[in-house]
């Protein structure tokens, strides 16, 4: 019992304490702070360049690390000195625990005297450091790069060369859009690398505006902008121009090499027959069409501006633009509620007179006057590229018209126009609020509604193969969504449903744009108007 009591009542061993570095001691720009949470929360994280290296709060300009106020800083020094005294006393008591009481007292007195002198020295050094280096420590040790002189105000600024509406990109879409009356135009943007070729083709490039990445404001051209920012922008422009010049120089070198090869081939040819070589650059850019585009823009008084390729990429959102973009208004679509009753005599008269026009709906497209009218309805298609490819098929086969649902369908975007190779710009496209209402109203006027599906309508109306149907009356062909096809409410209105039979059971359907081309070609080839 005695031994146990001695063990329980024995003094606790002294806890080991870490050496606390005085705040004025700085090692490679790293500061350490007191662990006394009463005076100041624990913060022993190294700080460099205004950031905490291993967690903790960030330190910014005019932020005192070890004191939110000067009083905290003073209290922190006192707490540090007291903690140093306590630690020294505890260490001395533990080391001299087996000595006599007189020696212990002498040691304590000696330690106290030393601590008092050290404390006075620390306080004097601390005051000198704070008074002499108060400003230098914030910039030298924190290394904060913040400079209020470089701050740019939020004054509204507008780039001179910027899009106002939609970006119609691609040579064919731009070419067709300029000749049609479905859009209004703001500006034409041409890649700077095409200017030398346009000059060779006889275009006066002096009328083409050059981009300098300039900004305009309501009051001052350079309001709120520092010289460093302007220099950076000029450097960026110089780099882009150098890059464009390198591309142009490479192209010119290739052209010279091709000319040399052609001359050598001509000299070696006894018949003096000039051999033509395929020029990828001319084929890709289609410089002849580009020349007509620039000429038409000058005639229509549309500003033509030269920009670098990066600007064109940003306008087209990374899609291939072929070096030309037209800033234009959205495409105009016509509203339609139903198709009128078809008059076969009017169709025959137009065929005899060589005229064109819509078949029953007034579509305005050039159509096949020797065939019954065929209209295509797109019900809730989501992909604009599919919509563009389908309209391209419709324009190629000269059907009477296209109707798009105004709800839950992809609009005619620049991506659809590019996918249609410009067909969306000239082919008249109609839209309706209700597909079901449009079909029912047209059906009452004698139109045959044909849907596309893989399943039968019912037991009495099986789904027919495409070869089992003929275009022997005015017909409306419906194509459904890429995923789920036609809606049940639309299938109930259909007089017939057709499908394309494939040979691979693992793939049960085709892309909707491919399906449209096959169905339109098959229907137009299956019947003609009576003579």
Swiss-Prot record:
Positions with biased composition (Low complexity): 74-136
Reaction it catalyzes: a uridine in rRNA + S-adenosyl-L-methionine = a 2'-O-methyluridine in rRNA + S-adenosyl-L-homocysteine + H(+)
Compartments it resides in: Mitochondrion
Keywords: Methyltransferase, Mitochondrion, rRNA processing, S-adenosyl-L-methionine, Transferase, Transit peptide
Bilayer-spanning residue ranges: none
Keyword Chloroplast: no
Biased composition (Acidic residues): 247-267
One term of GO molecular function: rRNA (guanine) methyltransferase activity
Leader peptide range in chain numbering: none
Enzyme Commission identifier(s): 2.1.1.-
Record-level GO BP terms: rRNA modification
Residue interval of the organelle targeting sequence: 1-40
Official protein name in the record: rRNA methyltransferase 1, mitochondrial
